[in-house]
Amino acid sequence: MTQDSRFPNLFILDHPLIQHKLSHMRDRDTSTRTFRELLREITLLMGYEITRNLPMTTRRLTTPLVEIDAPVIAGKKLAIVPVLRAGIGMSDGLLELVPSARVGHIGVYRAEDHRPVEYLVRLPDLEDRVFILCDPMVATGYSAVHAVDVLKRRNVAGENILFLALVAAPEGVQVFQDAHPDVKLYVASLDSHLNEHAYIVPGLGDAGDRLFGTKN
């Protein structure tokens, strides 16, 4: 895991398996089926990385041989909240890692001026939870900021929110950091820039279209 000195709340997950799978996802010739499978796999790997600092405690239990104080995750429960629609493809990998997690959804689409338009919010109970927001792309950053706003408006503290994405543009990361400096943003790659259409370069295209086999 590395950081960029420009963005203190950004963490780049540079594990070789994550980078290998991301490279295959970038390839325009990768099929919809393979893209979908890779998204699940890479999200599972990234989820493993971002949960490594969850607080631990011990629980007394009995093995077939003896009683022990065994390490278990302490305290706050997890909730996975994909940002629709492309974020749906990331929830399976995270649920494979944490099958007991609750799942919510935040529906946002990007208007012609690139601003987010909210059309759906369905969340589990908010008390004493850590929320993992997931969306494959942080391009302009506006949708990511809006998703965090949805939780903060409901009194979820920034320290209890993690945002997980595959690729991000520096422009979007700056917008996110300015709006939510208390929320950690985890990505597999910080790409070069946004083009004139607000697409990430080099990026991987439209993640939703590639995930579902649709055309923009």
From Swiss-Prot:
Keywords: Allosteric enzyme, Glycosyltransferase, GTP-binding, Magnesium, Nucleotide-binding, Transferase. It catalyses: UMP + diphosphate = 5-phospho-alpha-D-ribose 1-diphosphate + uracil. CDD domains: PRTases_typeI (cd06223). Its cofactor is Mg(2+). GO terms for molecular function: GTP binding; magnesium ion binding; uracil phosphoribosyltransferase activity. It holds the Pfam family UPRTase. It comes from the Bacteria. The keyword NAD does not apply. 5-phospho-alpha-D-ribose 1-diphosphate binds at R85, R110, D135, P136, M137, V138, A139, T140, G141, Y142, S143, D206. One of its GO terms (biological process) is UMP salvage. The keyword Flavoprotein does not apply. Its EC number is 2.4.2.9. Pathway: Pyrimidine metabolism; UMP biosynthesis via salvage pathway; UMP from uracil: step 1/1. Binds 1 Mg(2+) ion per subunit. The magnesium is bound as Mg-PRPP. Gene3D superfamilies: 3.40.50.2020. Allosterically activated by GTP. Uracil binds at I200, G205, D206, A207. Belongs to the UPRTase family. Catalyzes the conversion of uracil and 5-phospho-alpha-D-ribose 1-diphosphate (PRPP) to UMP and diphosphate. HAMAP family: Upp_B. PANTHER family: ADENINE PHOSPHORIBOSYLTRANSFERASE, URACIL PHOSPHORIBOSYLTRANSFERASE, CHLOROPLASTIC. This is Uracil phosphoribosyltransferase. The gene is upp.
